[in-house]
Amino acid sequence: WEVGECGPWRLIRHHLPCRGIAYAYRYFAMDGLAFDELPYATVLACVLGKLDTARHTAAELDTLVQAHLGNLGFAVEVHEDAEDRERIRPMFVMGSSALDEEVPWAARLAEEVLRETDFADTERIRDILGQRRIAMEQAFASAGHSAAMARVASYYLPAGVVREALSGVGFYRFLKELL
């Protein structure tokens, strides 16, 4: 791997044989968010790519992603220092994959979604978040032990506390209250 610069951004490039598929991940530190604001980052990750932008409807955007990309997704992660588990950093992640010849589409669509998403359709946002709530309930029913283990981890690991707020039972409770 190698570290490089592209404008104001630092890049880490891995040269791995991927059979003509390019993968790009962009990490945004969430250091500026207070703890009680962290669940809103998950809400943002849930709705980005599923709402209209200034140039395309959500349906058109979905068609473009299906036609030109393998994936365009958003998530939140917690990164832990391998040496010091007290040092954690929540990150907002945008990931995309595309065939090598479609990389310009990946860059263009990712930028459009990040910069031009229209958040005015509150009913659509409510629907998306309602689907997320239902999916979480189904996951609790089918793999409740995993949710319980993550919840227990929040009692002794700093990263567990943040994960709980971003995607665990804590986030589920936040989401229920929000809806």
Give the location of each predicted region:
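N- or domain-start disorder-to-order transition segments that initiate the globular core
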Residues: 1-22
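M16 family metallopeptidases and their MPP-like homologs
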Residues: 20-49, 56-116, 122-179
